C-alpha cells in the first residue's frame, strides 16, 4: 500500500511513480494509494482501513513524514510490525526512532544543504542571464538501520544547527 500526502502535488505524483517504478511489475500491482493531506492522524486511520481491506498486505510506504508516521503508528498499534515491511521518505525524530526499532526498513532522506545551496546558485545564475536547468536533483540517501550511524548519514539525520 502507498500512503501519500497531498493528492496531485508534484512531490506525491513523482514519489508514487518512482516507488512503483522501483518495484517493477510488483509496483503496478500495489494495493492502492490513499492521501492523508499531510495529517498523520488521517494516515493512521487510512492505514488501519487499508489493512482491514487487504489483510495479506505486506508492504507499506509513506511518501512524506506525516503519511509515513501515521502508517507506522497504525502498523504498530495493530501488532503487525513483523508482517509488514515499511519504507518512508523524510527523517523526523519519530521516523528515525521507527527505523532504529526496525519498524521501517529504510528511510529515503533528502539533502537539505544541497537544496539550499543549489537554489541560491541557480538564482544567481538566473539573475546573471545564464541558462539553467528546469529541474535540479539535490540528491537523497537511502538510510537503513545498518548504515544510519555512519558519519555522513549522521549529518543528514542529526544536523547540527545554531
Which residues does each PLM region occupy?
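Local beta-strand N-terminus motif with an aromatic residue
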Residues: 30, 56-57, 104
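Class I S-adenosyl-L-methionine
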Residues: 17-27, 72, 100, 124
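Paired acidic/hydrophobic, glycine-rich loop segments that form the ligand-binding mouth/hinge
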Residues: 61, 106-108
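Extracytoplasmic ligand-binding site segments that recognize negatively charged/polar headgroups
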Residues: 1-22
Amino acid at each position: 500500500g502507498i500512503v501519500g500526502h497531498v493528492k496531485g502535488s508534484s512531490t506525491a505524483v513523482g514519489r508514487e511513480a518512482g516507488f512503483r517504478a522501483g518495484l517493477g511489475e510488483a509496483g503496478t500491482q500495489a494495493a492502492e494509494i490513499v492521501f492523508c493531506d499531510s495529517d498523520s492522524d488521517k494516515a493512521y486511520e487510512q492505514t488501519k482501513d487499508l489493512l482491514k481491506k487487504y489483510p495479506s498486505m505486506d508492504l507499506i510506504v509513506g511518501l512524506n513524514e506525516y503519511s509515513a508516521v501515521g502508517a507506522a503508528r497504525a502498523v504498530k498499534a495493530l501488532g503487525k510490525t513483523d508482517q509488514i515491511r515499511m519504507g518512508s521518505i523524510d527523517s523526523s525524530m519519530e521516523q528515525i526512532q521507527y527505523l532504529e526499532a526496525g519498524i521501517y526498513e529504510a528511510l529515503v532522506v533528502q539533502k537539505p544543504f544541497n537544496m539550499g545551496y543549489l537554489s541560491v546558485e541557480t538564482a544567481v545564475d538566473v539573475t546573471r542571464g545564464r541558462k539553467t536547468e528546469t529541474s535540479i536533483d539535490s540528491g537523497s540517501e537511502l538510510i537503513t538501520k545498518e548504515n544510519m550511524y555512519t558519519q555522513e548519514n549522521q549529518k543528514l539525520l542529526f544536523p547540527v544547527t545554531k
